[in-house]
Regions:
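Short, surface-exposed beta-strand/strand-loop-strand elements in extracellular ectodomains
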Residues: 72-92
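Noncatalytic modules at the cell exterior or secretory-pathway interfaces
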Residues: 60-62, 107-127
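Beta-sandwich interaction modules
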Residues: 53, 98-109
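Bacterial N-terminal signal peptides
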Residues: 11-20
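Non-catalytic extracellular/lumenal accessory regions of secreted precursors
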Residues: 23-52, 136-153
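Bacterial N-terminal signal peptides that target proteins for export
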Residues: 2-12
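Short, surface-exposed binding/anchoring microloops in extracellular/periplasmic proteins
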Residues: 39-77
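Edge beta-strands of jelly-roll/beta-sandwich modules across compartments, strongly enriched
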Residues: 45-47, 76-78, 114, 122-149
Length: 153
């Protein structure tokens, strides 16, 4: 009996610890409906995120990926762009609704603000999640502010 209680406590502690580690090392938007009416092919979500040294080290880069939860629709994909002071990168979820994310892309511009854009390729509603991380030069997660939405239309 004592052994099973100990095993249970170890399991619970491991799950709680892993959940805590995941929560401090990943940033993910909630599910968002892009173009709720479905009638604006140029609908754009635009936000700003800042990277800073939270004690884990100076930021080197911003990494993003996007996941489209919507059912597949011909010629309708969700893309995300990250824009620094001098560089930008773009990624697209090529298979909507498959449970997978787009390829990660990265812009190396250190601390400060990064602009994030999410758009779609045509008419229709899309439901997406964006992941975003500030990383040190060694790939360690460092300070990442919550996005400040600038435009959603």
């Amino acid at each position: 009996m004592k052994r099973s209680v100990k095993q249970l406590l170890v399991t619970v502690f491991s799950i709680v610890t892993l959940g805590y580690i995941a929560s401090i090392s990943a940033h993910e938007s909630p599910r968002v409906i892009l173009d709720p009416e479905g009638n604006n092919p140029s609908f754009l979500a635009y936000a700003s995120v800042s990277c800073f040294d939270d004690g884990n080290g100076a930021p080197d880069s911003m990494v993003i990926s996007v996941q489209d939860f919507s059912a597949p629709q011909a010629n309708l994909l969700v893309s995300a762009q990250v824009i620094g002071k001098f560089h930008a990168a773009q990624t697209t979820d090529l298979v909507s609704g498959d449970g997978g994310y787009s390829a990660e892309v990265r812009v190396h511009e250190g601390a400060g603000p990064y602009l994030l854009l999410i758009n779609k390729s045509g008419h229709g509603t899309r439901e997406f999640v964006l992941t975003y991380h500030c990383l040190t030069i060694d790939g360690i997660h460092t300070g990442t502010n919550d996005p400040m939405v600038i435009q959603f239309q």
